[in-house]
Regions:
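A general marker of short, structured functional hotspots
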Residues: 11, 64-67, 263
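Positively charged n-region of N-terminal signal peptides that target proteins for export
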Residues: 1-6
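Active-site-adjacent loops and short helices of periplasmic peptidoglycan-processing enzymes
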Residues: 19-186, 197-201
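Bacterial N-terminal signal peptides
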Residues: 7-16
């Protein structure tokens, strides 16, 4: 998560924590899992959490990072969905969830991708990884570099499948960031996580995410289970334009991870709402610029700003602009020149940078002289 978004998410998390102390927002449900987290996708606000920073085995949730890198390489043209991939003996021998690949056979790349996402197949996963990288070890190096890039400081990968291994771990916090990045950066690929069944060589297998059948608002994202990890599930649901993500790790069984996810999602949708405060890249206000070719500068946000708040309180939401200094040219497009403050009633809940939406070059001698006279006269 880049710095402005992390800062905003922290501010919103603190606000939501305070809101939960209000009698209008009940405490989060007690769910049976070792660590869990509920968050809003658009605002990044954490609505409820338990031990979300603890390092645990992530099981096949690992494949979210594998998928992210595969999607990156697909977008850049390093592989294609229509090409054929030869299955290595090592890929075919993978234990755990499989689509029963045979060494030496040639399989369409898209079939392998669907097998990895829908069935969480380890043989399909490794066949893809070996195709796009020198070997699994080289691919895992890329996975850890990407984890560092995303700020996943509680995460380290040892393999691409999620099988239990010493030094292979993540946290609910980190997995939320990873899942959110995948949804945001590859919306065209995210639809694959909603596919309920997968057929290969006349064998039909089903998506292990039971919520795809139980809740029509759920459209992904991934299950996992190993002896060390227990039963895990990251579920995303969208209702009335609001998207939530629930991360449940270390449940005792399949029913436990499903129940925990359902309870968390229902709690979030029932008691919170997310509002768009301002679009990104559009003028929010205009300010005076001195010593420049132009006398006014449009200010706005880098990206859309959403806030999550207790239901029914959006009428109390208001904003203010704080530039706080005389702006003098030159000013570059994208330069941070102030802040947008957001409050709910008298409680500040967010503050994000205002940027210049256009550049203002230094004015000519006459323009600068005229502005100096105006400033002197003030």
């Amino acid at each position: 998560m880049d710095r402005p978004l992390r800062w905003l998410a922290i501010a919103l998390a603190l606000f939501v924590a305070n809101a939960q102390a209000d009698s209008s927002v009940p405490a989060a449900p007690r769910v049976s899992a070792s660590t869990w987290l509920l968050a809003d996708f658009d605002s990044g606000a954490r609505l409820a959490a338990h031990d979300a920073g603890r390092r645990v085995a992530p099981a096949s949730l690992t494949k979210l990072m594998t998928a992210y890198l595969l999607f990156e390489k697909l977008r850049s043209g390093k592989w294609m969905l229509g090409e054929q991939i030869n299955v290595s003996p090592r890929a075919a021998a993978q234990r755990g969830a499989r689509i029963f690949l045979v060494p030496g056979q040639s399989v369409p790349a898209e079939t392998l991708l669907q097998g990895m996402i829908v069935r969480s197949a380890n043989d399909a996963t490794l066949a893809l990884v070996e195709h796009v990288a020198e070997n699994e070890r080289a691919f895992v190096v890329e996975m850890n570099h990407k984890a560092d890039e995303f700020g996943l400081h509680g995460t380290h990968f040892v393999n691409a499948t999620g099988l239990d291994a010493a030094g292979h771990y993540s946290t609910a916090n980190d997995l939320l960031i990873l899942a959110s990045r995948l949804l945001r950066d590859f919306p065209e690929q995210y639809r694959r996580f909603a596919v309920r069944e997968f057929a290969y060589q006349e064998l039909k297998q089903y998506n292990r995410n039971a919520l795809l059948w139980r809740d029509s608002s759920v459209d992904g994202i991934k299950t996992g289970r190993t002896q060390q990890a227990g039963f895990c599930l990251i579920a995303s649901a969208s209702r009335n334009g609001m998207r939530l993500i629930a991360v449940v790790l270390g449940a005792a069984d399949e029913a436990g991870r499903v129940s925990a996810s359902e309870q968390l999602l229902d709690y979030g949708f029932r008691h919170f709402e997310t509002r768009l405060v301002m679009q990104g890249g559009e003028p929010a206000t205009r300010v005076r610029v001195w010593m420049g070719e132009a006398s006014e500068l449009p200010l706005g946000l880098e990206r859309p700003l959403f806030v999550t708040l207790p239901r029914g309180q959006h009428a109390q939401l208001h904003t203010r602009f704080d530039v706080g200094q005389l702006l003098t040219a030159p000013i570059a497009a994208g330069e941070r020149v102030g802040f947008l403050g957001v409050a709910l009633g008298d409680k500040p809940i967010a503050q994000v940078p205002l940027i210049a939406l256009s550049a203002v070059d230094t004015g000519n001698i006459l323009q600068r002289a005229f502005d100096r006279i105006q400033l002197w006269a003030q």
